Amino acid sequence: MSNKKIIKIIKLQIPGGKANPAPPIGPALGAAGVNIMGFCKEFNAATQDRPGDLLPVVITVYSDKTFSFVMKQSPVSSLIKKALGLESGSKIPNRNKVGKLTRAQITAIAEQKMKDMDVVLLESAERMVEGTARSMGVDVE
């Protein structure tokens, strides 16, 4: 596919297994001339093992209206909410705390997210996870 000309790159966050032609997917792909249902079927098939997880996806549209997509790991904030069973973070993170992450949970999230982060050491990835947790109003052990 390297000989095809790229005409557009679309970045979206879609729940796993729940892609449909409704906004924001339909308008973004329709404007690029991509077969919307074709993308939805491929994405849902690729993410059927991760239902409900919020997944960043980068869709590359080529000049002949074909496409390819790359899925990334869920955002750190989404992984933290899943680990603690939260709906959302704190509205006032410095005052209201909504949960507490253990060292083991931080390490597990950092290991899962490591390939999408621009870090070499696990320790650096853990610090990034801790920072995200603090900004959400989650205490870190």
From Swiss-Prot:
It comes from the Bacteria. InterPro entries: Ribosomal_uL11, Ribosomal_uL11_bac-typ, Ribosomal_uL11_C, Ribosomal_uL11_C_sf, Ribosomal_uL11_CS, Ribosomal_uL11_N, Ribosomal_uL11_N_sf. Coiled coil: none annotated. One or more lysine residues are methylated. GO terms for cellular component: cytosolic large ribosomal subunit. Keywords: Methylation, Ribonucleoprotein, Ribosomal protein, RNA-binding, rRNA-binding. Pfam families: Ribosomal_L11, Ribosomal_L11_N. SMART domains: RL11. GO terms for molecular function: large ribosomal subunit rRNA binding; structural constituent of ribosome. SUPFAM superfamilies: Ribosomal L11/L12e N-terminal domain (SSF54747), Ribosomal protein L11, C-terminal domain (SSF46906). One of its GO terms (biological process) is translation. Belongs to the universal ribosomal protein uL11 family. Part of the ribosomal stalk of the 50S ribosomal subunit. Interacts with L10 and the large rRNA to form the base of the stalk. L10 forms an elongated spine to which L12 dimers bind in a sequential fashion forming a multimeric L10(L12)X complex. Forms part of the ribosomal stalk which helps the ribosome interact with GTP-bound translation factors. This is Large ribosomal subunit protein uL11. It comes from Chlamydia trachomatis serovar L2 (strain ATCC VR-902B / DSM 19102 / 434/Bu). The lineage of its organism: Bacteria, Pseudomonadati, Chlamydiota, Chlamydiia, Chlamydiales.
